[in-house]
C-alpha cells in the first residue's frame, strides 16, 4: 500500500525474536524492549550492517491476528509495520495457561 517492497522473513532474526519472547515468558527480562540494542547488535554481527531497526512486542492469551490488529491500531506499532524495512523476524513463546509473548523485529 505504501509503495514499499514486501518484507523478507529472516530465520536468524526470527531466532533472536523467539529468544526475546522466551526471556519475557520466563521472567528473565521484563515485558517490553529491554535489551533491544543488544538484540540488534547480535543480528548485525550475523547479517552485517543495519541502518535502522524497530521492534514490536505483545503479550496475552490472543491469536496472531489479534496481536497484529492491536499493533495496527497503535500509532507507534503501526509505524514500525509500515516502515521502510527490508527484513523481519517473528518469535512467540507460549505458556501452559495460554499466555503468549510475541516479538517482531524489523531491520534495514
Describe each region flagged by the PLM.
Residues 1-108:
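Functional surface patches built around histidine and acidic residues
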